[in-house]
Amino acid sequence: MSNNLAIQLREGTSKSHSMAENVSFVKSFLSGVIDTNSYKKMMSNLYFVYKAMEEEMEYHKENDLIKPIYFVELNRSESLALDLNFYYGDTWKDIIEPSEATRVYINRIKKISKEKPLLLIAHAYTRYLGDLSGGQILKKIAQRALNVPNSQGLAFYEFDKIDDEQAFKQKYKKALDTLPVTDKMISQIVAEANIAFNLNMRMFQELEMSYIRIFTKILMQFLINSKDKLRVMLNFS
């Protein structure tokens, strides 16, 4: 018997989903405007999030509520590790660290894993369904914006162990719909999914502020240089 969890998650998080997509950093990325440094930082933050989530999912993989939606072929942390090696080099693990917003996200995942692992379903849904839905589009955008050769540094968007991503997405939704959950549990999962979207939004907003600071610094330096050049020109006139 279906519990309609997939539909309830989609409908119950529609507002949060829309808010996350409308963060300026995300809109900029979707329009093909992103610099390599910001992209690298985004990937490193996602690495820490996926690593935490996938470790906790694996820990609970025999749990009756987690087992039906535990698919190792969805795991992204190893793919992200390949990308980070491309962008940062072999010593990437010594270079990257989670941002403040990312630490909050990780701590939330670890907290619910310990106290109520049922809620891990919400985080898996939020990340993996998004990856399966828009991965190839985002890959093309990133490839054009970053001008990377032969799709290098874009392993995050590739599901090598999944032949048909759309079919797998339907399989995942069906697995959600057959979980042995009560109405109360569904409400808790939907509420946690909204928290997950908010945590993602905070990470993107943090990157947005970092991007603004960098842009402002570049603009100020440009204005200073222009002023100096103008002064030199006036002295020679």
From Swiss-Prot:
It comes from Guillardia theta. One of its GO terms (biological process) is photosynthesis. The keyword Lipoprotein does not apply. It holds the Pfam family Heme_oxygenase. Heme b binds at residue 17. It is found in: Plastid, Chloroplast. PANTHER family: HEME OXYGENASE. Catalyzes the opening of the heme ring with the release of iron. Key enzyme in the synthesis of the chromophoric part of the photosynthetic antennae. It is an enzyme of class 1 (oxidoreductase). Signal peptide: none annotated. This is Heme oxygenase. It catalyses: heme b + 3 reduced [NADPH--hemoprotein reductase] + 3 O2 = biliverdin IXalpha + CO + Fe(2+) + 3 oxidized [NADPH--hemoprotein reductase] + 3 H2O + H(+).
